[in-house]
């Protein structure tokens, strides 16, 4: 569900804000969606992020070139799993979901900036 919400909103954000949307708004939206759904459904934060990464990875395979599609998929799975671990660890230390989302957003935003600007 979080992947569907993110997909629909990301299309609007990317049309309106281009690279800035991808490096600032998309990570915020995705971290909010993943973590909010995990809390709402009382399920694993890390697991939710992992499944999101798998869904994004499948999307990457079908929408990227054959040369980079599989690597983009691996990067999606690993990065979203990492963001899930960051979210979980921050939440267990602070017990404040807003702080957990904020910290994971910073990491996610930094990752997207690196991908957009350096790769």
Give the role of each language-model region.
Residues 1-119:
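Hydrophobic alpha-helical segments at protein termini of multi-pass membrane proteins
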